[in-house]
Amino acid sequence: MRVLHCFDAENARLGASDIARRSDLPSSTAHRLVVELTSVKLLERFADGKYGISTHAWETFVRANPLERLRLQAQSILGDVHDEMGQYVSLAVPDFSDRTILYVERFDAPDSYIRILGRHASRLDVHTTSSGLVMLAFASPQTIKAVTSTPFKDSITGEITDGAAVAAMLPEIRAKGHIVFVGGLVPENTAVAAPVVDRKGLVRAAMGVVARTGEIDVNHVTSTVLDACQKLSLRLQKDAIY
């Protein structure tokens, strides 16, 4: 996995020495792993000698990953919200063990002036995002206790936030059923997010809308997001996999 984690949107093709450096593995070990991953078609070697994630890997991971099923279930609902709002809309899932969220789908605003940090297939901290906070608020008491038991460190700014301060925010978010987050990671933005739950009431995802503060009708966006999350929750509850 250390080899596969070397690749991202900005580093889609890497040489063997780059992989060794980025994975912090000895050159001989990195080279051996690259050869093995190429032999089983998880990596592809290009004409310039560099490597990248193979089409076969993408096909295998997408076909077998339940997140792709969730993404497809949500796509039309997200699209409807995007068409109505004309703003950035996203779907994220929690990774409470890592205290992060993972963005699995997004629709961008038609204009590019709004600054957005949440990218498709990228992670952000659970405590600095509207989607992260609303999912944590709807997590089990045991999960909340575990996640907030130690201070949080912002992966972007390095700022430390007391876990108890985050925990204190959650009851109000849960009572309201959503969060309106003004500022946050991008000071000029306002985000609205709500949870998506399965048939057992477990939080599976969160849907969020982000716009520039002052250019958003919070009440209308909140109503739209809550309605969309209810629709997606009902879809999941009818799906035997959830």
Please name every model-derived segment.
Residues D98, K176, R199-K200:
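Residue-level recognition of short loop/turn positions
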Residues S155-I156, P187:
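Intrinsically disordered, low-complexity polar/acidic regions
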Residues G163-K176, V180, L185-E188, V203-Y242:
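Juxtadomain coupling helices with adjacent low-complexity linkers
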Residues M1-L67, S233-L234, K238:
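N-terminal helix-turn-helix
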Residues V192-R199:
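A short, hydrophobic, proline-anchored segment that marks a local hinge/packing element in signaling
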Residues M1-L14, G79-E105, D227-Y242:
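An N-terminal domain-start capping segment
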Residues G52-T150:
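Amphipathic alpha-helical effector-binding/dimerization core
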